[in-house]
A protein has these predicted regions:
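Conserved alpha/beta core surface patches that mediate binding of polyanionic ligands
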Residues: 360
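Acidic, Mg2+-coordinating catalytic modules of nucleic-acid enzymes
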Residues: 289
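Concave beta-strand-loop units of leucine-rich repeat
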Residues: 1-18, 28-40, 44, 50-69, ...
Length: 516
């Protein structure tokens, strides 16, 4: 007279469990786990009327399995089915009126559930996780009034969300079409959710969304993530005014339309710890972010031609920031970063930058990844990298623009990835690579410069595995790569630009060599 039984996943080389007829003699069984099995015949389960929990997660069901024997398990409280199961008739589950939790566990590349009508009588179900496929209707969900969490994932095209309106207990809503283009929720606004005032999390993929109208009264929201199945160009959200009263928000992610210019509704969301905005929006400064002092993550990504920012003073008060991803076009100064000493990752993307020094970075000693926006080819003044000298935690550095000197990099021995595109023109004084000789931990390096023809210091960077050299000029081509014979860990080498290499024996040990 046991209450639980567990058939675990078989060890490699053994056969999976396929026969569960023995459990028919366990009428008092309350908990049964058949994870990783290959059971196809469920009839032995039909008499287990005391069963409360049944798990098939990660079971191997390559063909449709008859779920009819489960219909008699009316005391069943929780059921997990394998996510990778073959398309199966789920209607027998409609008899499990005491079910509070239903999930499809394990990995699934393709969802297949296209009909939800069998859910209409499951008014006790509390949590629902379903892999769907080409789902076009939510009909059936209106009866699952006890739901607090709904998670539908897979290809879907939903134009009518009204079945959700009756789910007054819903706290967490996830509708994600796995990036299916033109899929997800296809609606202009979110008025269908306006009565779901207990919602704390919304995570949906929405196409055609123009306004957030409908969420203004959802004041319990702590997380709002709205994705777009296409790229930036397809986003259509241009009205975010409804956000201003959602002061409990901690996480916010949006894809916005190209013609949106007013981000002031974000300024009052002072509890935000994570903010992500993507789109081809227009922006001339980030001052509307100045009061969001609880932010740990900030992502504002778009087209740098539409985002023309002179400096970063708009974010200077965000001293708790750890991750910063900003698109900045025509950036003239890094001023504004000086006091953001908790930063570990900085990604400043964009073009036409003209900043000439990195002094604002000198106190950011926790930074591990640093990418600076591309300086324009027409910027004559070389950039001083001295501000990096104390950034000894730096592991990855990406820079494009004319460089004054590489000397500030000499002490950055934690570096693993280095990408330098020196945009100085041919004829200017040679760029000395000797500061790189101490960077023996660098494994991947890209170096481009017309004023480099002596690469001998690179031969001391013995940790290198991948090396791209786009160096040399018409007057001073790259000829000698003998120093590279010391790079015994090197597996890939490319030499491009102006090269006149006649002796390739120094890289004979390298598996992949390309010399243009």
């Amino acid at each position: 007279k046991g209450t639980g039984a567990h058939a675990a996943s078989p060890q490699e080389g053994n056969n999976a469990v396929t026969d569960i007829s023995a459990v028919a003699n366990m009428p008092y069984l309350e908990n049964l786990r058949l994870r990783g099995t290959s059971v196809q015949d469920l009839s032995p389960l039909s008499g287990l009327e005391e069963l409360r929990e049944l798990q098939f997660g990660d079971a191997v069901w390559d063909t449709a399995v008859d779920l009819t024997p489960l219909a008699t398990l009316t005391n069943l409280d929780y059921l997990s089915l394998p996510a990778s199961m073959a398309p199966t008739d789920l209607s027998p589950l409609g008899e499990l009126t005491n079910l509070t939790g239903l999930s499809f566990d394990g990995s699934s590349n393709n969802g297949w559930i296209t009909d939800l009508t069998w859910l209409s009588d499951l008014n006790q179900i509390d949590q629902l996780y379903l892999p769907v496929g080409e789902l076009t209707s939510l009909k059936g969900l209106e009866g699952a009034t006890a739901l607090t969490e709904l998670n539908l994932y897979g290809p879907m095209y939903l134009t009518d969300l009204t079945p959700l309106a009756s789910l007054k207990n819903l706290q967490r809503l996830y509708l994600y079409s796995n990036g299916t283009s033109g899929g997800g929720v296809v609606t202009k606004d979110l008025t269908c959710l306006s009565s779901l005032t207990r919602l704390s999390e919304i995570n949906i993929e929405a196409d055609g969304l123009e306004s957030l109208r409908g969420i203004e009264n959802l004041t319990e929201l702590t997380s709002l993530r709205i994705y777009n199945s296409g790229n930036y160009d397809t986003a259509s959200l241009r009205d975010i005014s409804q956000l201003q009263n959602l002061t409990k928000l901690k996480e916010l992610q949006l894809y916005v339309a190209a013609d949106i210019q007013d981000f002031s509704p974000l300024s009052g969301l002072t509890g935000l710890t994570s903010l992500q905005v993507n789109g081809n929006f227009i922006c001339s400064d980030y001052s509307f972010l100045s009061g969001l002092t609880e932010l740990r993550e900030l992502y504002f990504n778009g087209d740098s031609q539409n985002i023309r920012i002179k400096d970063l003073t708009g974010i200077q008060n965000l001293t708790k920031l750890q991750t910063l991803h900003l698109t900045v076009g025509a950036l003239e100064s890094l001023h504004g970063l000086e006091n953001l000493t908790e930063l570990t990752d900085i990604y400043l993307t964009g073009s036409d930058a003209s900043f000439t020094d990195t002094a604002p970075l000198q106190n950011l000693t926790k930074v591990k990844t640093l990418r600076l926006p591309n300086r324009g080819y027409d910027v004559e003044t070389a950039c001083d990298l001295s501000g990096l000298a104390r950034m000894t935690s730096l592991q990855e550095f990406n820079f494009s623009g004319k460089i004054k000197s590489l000397a500030p990099l000499a002490g950055l021995t934690s570096l693993r990835v280095l990408d330098i595109n020196d945009q100085a023109r041919d004829g200017e004084p040679a760029l000395d690579l000797s500061p790189l000789a101490s960077l023996k931990g660098v494994t991947d390096m890209t170096l481009q410069s017309q004023r480099v023809s002596d690469v001998s210091p690179v031969g001391q960077m013995t940790g290198l595995r991948t090396l791209y050299l786009g160096v040399g000029s018409y007057e001073h081509p790259l000829r000698d790569i003998s120093a590279l014979s010391n790079l015994t860990n090197l597996s890939s080498f490319t030499a491009s630009g102006w090269t006149e290499i006649t002796d390739t024996s120094p890289v004979a040990h390298v598996a992949n060599v390309t010399i243009n």
